[in-house]
Amino acid sequence: MAISQSLRNRAVVVEKFITLAATAGTNVGVSVPAGTLVLAAGIETMSAVPDVSVYTADVTDGSTIFANDVSLDAAAKNTIRAGVTPGFVAAADTIDVVTTITGSPGAIPVRVWAVIIDVNGCVVPAAEVDRDTLA
């Protein structure tokens, strides 16, 4: 018997709206469960970012940097920056934004997103029943 497509794990987009602090540091992003493959991750600015000397961000779970040194300096509202470095998250974790800032951009609202697949087993094979052995 074929496995129904609706029973299989699928890629989904998870997101969280956060406000990046006005100074360099780590901002907690989306939560992902154990056994998750991250295919891509990134940031979307919800307002314009001022032009300062340096404003870069890493989207990371602490082990894998999914989007490395994406520039947010002078980014327009709704600018999407992404990285496509895949990574496996073995234990439940968060995908955070680590910023490097030189200047004073102020607090910046953003949407942190990731395309993920839960790769834990999702389907259990059917057990044999009497009708399968009668005939």
Predicted regions and their residues:
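Surface-exposed, low-hydrophobicity beta-strand/loop segments enriched in small/polar/acidic residues
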Residues: M1-A135
